[in-house]
């Protein structure tokens, strides 16, 4: 862990230390040579159209020189003269204040995603391997349990925001999650036979049509369904809403472009660590004495790690509130005071009406819903094959541990290239990579599922079965898709909130992340239910699911292109508001 932290610190330091401190020029633009201490909060010339770069560069240089009460130089003179060397003490101070602000954020994301991976793997094992259950229960869970729960939480969250500070809301929500997960392992699961209505479920199964059996399974294993719902909400609420909402409030657009991809370094190392922890716990089950409940013992260890990780996150949030947000070198005190005073007093109905009339929020919601529907369509089909290959909870959990580890490794590698993509190609290209990745890898998986005979020679040559080959290709598809999501889609989505006003940030983020994500998954699940009702089985519905997947991704790509234009426009407006060149021109005249 210390080595990973050191790597992140060095990467952050590299972004802060001016190139002339090492005796070489990294920047081609003369204005950029003056370093972060001069250009903090100013827009990057690389994001300005070429036709206006020269004039704007001159104004930037004059503006900064006027502030330091030095002689005004022309652009040509600025290019000819060498900048004054920056003192090592200034470099150390710049590195220190940035590490103080960004390292705790990276650690928070590490432990939040550490918990998320454990919860994600555990919830699948619980509901898929439960009595009279299977992968077909997932579409019904997401439609009839997850979506109503998400809508209810959005109403609660909106009410809490109007009554409490954002810091208190963070602690309240985190405490609720951690209390349930701790109680599930210690109280609920050991008493599951008393809590589960098995007799009533058996009676319902005796006369209801087969289409309703997944709903009966949810009723039978209602505590597992509750765990599945809250574990699923951890990703949309704690990761997307609480963490990224807080990070967006205290981070500028320029900082986000530089450091949001780097946050993924620690975040995806969390996937590796948590995956190996799940695998380690799965191995301990075999050493338990006869008569012991191996899955109950595993739950105790897994949920203990979740509660401990959540406690660390709350401690880091307290450190940010008391030591970072009160430091004027880390956060502008005027902006922080304004942020704390901001209250969202609109009712939920007014907020929903406002967001429905916002093309920006609609396009952003389309991205989130599109990802949820696309990944759900592919994932459910893959998990049905995964249960057939690993029917035992121990082997299923061990496979998911390895799956999470590989997801972390692949995402970590993709994350290293994320900043290069943002820097060279911009937000628009980065936003298109995830849907294109899902489209190509999904086509490969569905091809194997639809045309197994065509791949029979390959299966025989590899010495495996068609089932295992489908499991492995589906795993590769999910790993690449999630890697693209974590390394590019999530940073793109969070950057899109930064130029928005306070109302759109808070209510818009709540609506998009907490409702949009489950709506996407529930929408995909609802489509699967309709196809299953029409064609009888999920396997017979696969060709139509492939066509629906293509249509969803086309809509996703169109929304990303539209949002890119709006994002660039709003970012330019935000930069002009923070850096009014017109006012300087008037003073110059």
Describe each region flagged by the PLM.
Residues 164-169, 252, 286, 298, ...:
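A helix-boundary/kink motif common to multi-pass secondary transporters
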Residues 25-30, 75-107, 163-168, 175, ...:
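Intracellular loop-helix junctions on the cytosolic face of multi-pass helical membrane proteins
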Residues 181, 310, 435, 441-442, ...:
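A generic transmembrane-helix signature of 12-TM secondary carrier transporters
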């Amino acid at each position: 862990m210390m080595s990973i932290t050191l790597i992140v610190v060095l990467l952050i330091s590299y972004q802060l230390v001016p190139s002339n401190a090492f005796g070489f020029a990294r920047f081609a633009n003369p204005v950029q040579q003056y370093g972060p201490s001069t250009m903090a909060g100013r827009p990057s010339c690389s994001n300005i159209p070429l036709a206006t770069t020269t004039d704007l560069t001159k104004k930037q240089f004059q503006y900064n020189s006027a502030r330091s009460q030095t002689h005004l130089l022309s652009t040509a003179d600025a290019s000819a003269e060498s900048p004054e060397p920056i003192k090592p003490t200034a470099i150390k101070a710049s590195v220190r204040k940035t590490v103080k602000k960004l390292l705790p954020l990276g650690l928070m994301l590490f432990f939040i995603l550490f918990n998320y991976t454990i919860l994600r793997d555990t919830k699948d094992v619980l509901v898929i391997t439960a009595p009279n259950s299977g992968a077909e229960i997932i579409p019904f869970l997401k439609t009839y349990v997850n979506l109503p729960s998400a809508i209810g939480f959005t109403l609660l969250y909106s009410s809490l925001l109007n009554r409490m500070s954002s810091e208190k809301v963070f602690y309240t929500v985190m405490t609720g999650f951690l209390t349930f997960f701790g109680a599930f392992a210690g109280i609920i699961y050991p008493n599951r036979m008393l809590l589960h209505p098995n007799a009533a479920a058996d009676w319902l199964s005796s006369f209801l049509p087969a289409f309703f059996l997944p709903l009966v399974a949810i009723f039978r294993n209602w505590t597992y369904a509750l765990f599945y719902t809250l574990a699923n909400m951890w990703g949309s609420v704690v990761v997307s809403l609480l963490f990224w909402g807080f990070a967006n409030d205290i981070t500028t657009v320029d900082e986000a472009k530089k450091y949001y991809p780097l946050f993924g370094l620690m975040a995806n190392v969390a996937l590796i660590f948590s995956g190996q922890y799940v695998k380690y716990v799965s191995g301990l089950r075999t050493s338990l004495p006869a008569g012991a409940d191996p899955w109950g013992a595993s739950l105790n260890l897994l949920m203990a790690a979740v509660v401990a990780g959540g406690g660390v996150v709350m401690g880091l949030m307290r450190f940010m509130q008391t030591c970072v947000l009160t430091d004027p070198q880390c956060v502008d005190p005027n902006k922080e005071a304004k942020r704390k005073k901001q209250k969202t007093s609109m009712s939920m109905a007014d907020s929903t009406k406002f967001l429905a009339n916002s093309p920006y929020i609609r396009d952003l919601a389309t991205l989130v819903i599109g990802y949820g529907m696309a990944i759900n369509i592919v994932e459910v089909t893959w998990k049905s094959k995964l249960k057939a290959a690993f029917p035992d909870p121990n082997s299923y959990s061990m496979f998911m541990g390895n799956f999470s580890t590989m997801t972390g490794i692949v995402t970590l590698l993709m994350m290293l290239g994320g900043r290069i993509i943002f820097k060279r190609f911009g937000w628009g290209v980065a936003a298109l990579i995830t849907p294109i990745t899902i489209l190509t890898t999904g086509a490969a998986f569905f091809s194997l599922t639809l045309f197994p005979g065509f791949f029979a020679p390959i299966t025989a040559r590899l010495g495996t079965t068609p089932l295992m080959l489908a499991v492995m290709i589906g795993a590769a598809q999910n790993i690449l898709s999630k890697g693209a999501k974590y390394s590019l889609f999530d940073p793109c989505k969070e950057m899109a909130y930064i130029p928005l006003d306070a109302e759109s940030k808070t209510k818009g983020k709540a609506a998009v992340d907490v409702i949009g994500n489950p709506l996407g998954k529930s929408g995909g699940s609802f489509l699967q239910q309709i196809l299953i009702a029409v064609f009888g089985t999920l396997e017979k519905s696969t060709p139509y699911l492939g066509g629906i997947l293509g249509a969803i991704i086309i809509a996703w790509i169109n929304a990303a292109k539209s949002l890119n234009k709006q994002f660039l426009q709003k970012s330019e407006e935000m930069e002009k508001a923070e850096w009014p060149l017109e006012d300087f021109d008037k003073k110059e005249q």
